[in-house]
Swiss-Prot record:
Lineage summary: Bacteria, Pseudomonadati, Pseudomonadota, Gammaproteobacteria, Alteromonadales
Protein name: Holliday junction branch migration complex subunit RuvA
Domain II: annotated segments: 65-143
Keyword DNA repair: yes
Region (Domain I): 1-64
Amino acid sequence: MIGRLRGMLVEKNSPEILIECAGVGYEVTMPMTSIYALPELEQQATIYTHFVVREDAQLLYGFANKVERKLFRLLIKVNGVGPKLALAILSNMSADQFVSCVRHDDISAIVKIPGVGKKTAERLLIEMRDRLKDWQAQQIHLVSDDGVIPEQLSAELSQETTFVNDNKGDAINALLSLGYKQVQADKAVKSVYNRGMSSENIIRDALKSMI
């Protein structure tokens, strides 16, 4: 079991990253909430992982902290919820936001997540209620290795990097991989895009606009 990786962040192609540890590059799929917390490329990053072995593939899912990984592991125990849908849930809301939805039976917020229909949302509320009854609100302040919090890092990246239209394309592709339809992804990105935005910021704002 691979539980944690620490190494140089080589690539970010949301929702996938490539992290090099001791000369080995690991492809890891992450929820957008975790990708927002990553440092710049060529910087050291630490991610917590969940390893899945299937007949046709070996897959690594990564998270910025143990809390997100814990919720991911609870989600994939729900009947009909696989890793892809669990990642979509965590990409659209934080762990505590999801827990709040469950505790308040807020089905309207959950059905807005791509891939979650009414029946799946109802099943999530029912099955997760008992599993989350002892969940404590998590006050997590993620800090990168250079002491910069994710919000500051995103702002600095937006100011310092020269952006091209590829960022819009990357954002659209990321939304498609999360289960949104082409029309939804195009419309959401177009509605939030401003010149100079990083792909991560475009994705984050686009997701907010659809919830």
